[in-house]
Amino acid sequence: MKGFILALQFFTRIPININIDFNEKNIKRAFYFLPLIGGLIAGLVLIPIYFLPQKYIEISGFISLLLYLFLTGSIHLDGVGDTIDGFFSARKKEKILEIMQDPRIGTYGTIGLNVFLLLRYINYSTIIPDAGLLILAGIISRLSGLAVVVFSKPAKDTGLGLLFHKSASKFSFFFWLVLVCFLSLFTPEIAAFSKIQGTFILVERLKYLLLPLTAFILTFIIIRISYKKIGGITGDVNGLIVELTELAVLSTSFFINVHL
């Protein structure tokens, strides 16, 4: 339970007044629960969407957006703004890292944040009747973040990034990878919170593996860009990956339903 509580305390703003030592052992445990935390956040964000009348979907979508910002403390969105500011500055590594650490936000970061917030609001206000997709997208996006911590190198030799890299377990990633691939096969049922309708045909369900595949391809691309720009990964870059892959999973699901 220490890992779960620490994950809640670090990755959400849910008030839990329990003192957990922030050490390598407990951090390792916390990463086992990271994808679960993503699903939990998405589930809580669903409450206004699912229980308010559909005719008020624009209002419930806005409330859900505010709830998401509150639950996460904008921890990942902060990384979106910082990363976009740094990467679009066309500077050398040291200057890019300096820009990313600057608490002020620049023009590129402001534009990027507004785009991400708009896309998230659009998803929240149009996702009915596939609201359950938010939970699957939340899980997959945090799995992408876990992949970054496990398999990429930090851009700096100090700080939380290095501690996380040392603490994260490959087993936790592969455990969740298998589970996510299994869950993806049941995307229609998860989306609608329903039982299997008709006969389950595995070949027809394989298309839903595009959901985690899209997330991992995007993750790989951003990692390569980050290596080229700053020689590794920072928490800000990981925040961008989490936000981007969540939106990508939702968009990919829409594409599958319409075209495949």
Swiss-Prot record:
Enzymatic reactions: alpha-ribazole + adenosylcob(III)inamide-GDP = adenosylcob(III)alamin + GMP + H(+); alpha-ribazole 5'-phosphate + adenosylcob(III)inamide-GDP = adenosylcob(III)alamin 5'-phosphate + GMP + H(+)
Listed EC numbers: 2.7.8.26
Keyword annotations of the record: Cell inner membrane, Cell membrane, Cobalamin biosynthesis, Magnesium, Membrane, Transferase, Transmembrane, Transmembrane helix
Pathway: Cofactor biosynthesis; adenosylcobalamin biosynthesis; adenosylcobalamin from cob(II)yrinate a,c-diamide: step 7/7
GO biological process, one term: cobalamin biosynthetic process
GO CC terms, sorted: plasma membrane
Subcellular location(s) per record: Cell inner membrane
Bilayer-spanning residue ranges: 31-51, 57-77, 108-128, 131-151, 173-193, 206-226, 240-260
Cofactor dependence: Mg(2+)
Major localization listed first in the record, in broad terms: membrane
Organism domain of life: Bacteria
Membrane topology: Multi-pass membrane protein
Gene Ontology MF, one: adenosylcobinamide-GDP ribazoletransferase activity
Family affiliation: Belongs to the CobS family.
Function field: Joins adenosylcobinamide-GDP and alpha-ribazole to generate adenosylcobalamin (Ado-cobalamin). Also synthesizes adenosylcobalamin 5'-phosphate from adenosylcobinamide-GDP and alpha-ribazole 5'-phosphate.
Record's protein name: Adenosylcobinamide-GDP ribazoletransferase
Organism: Treponema denticola (strain ATCC 35405 / DSM 14222 / CIP 103919 / JCM 8153 / KCTC 15104)
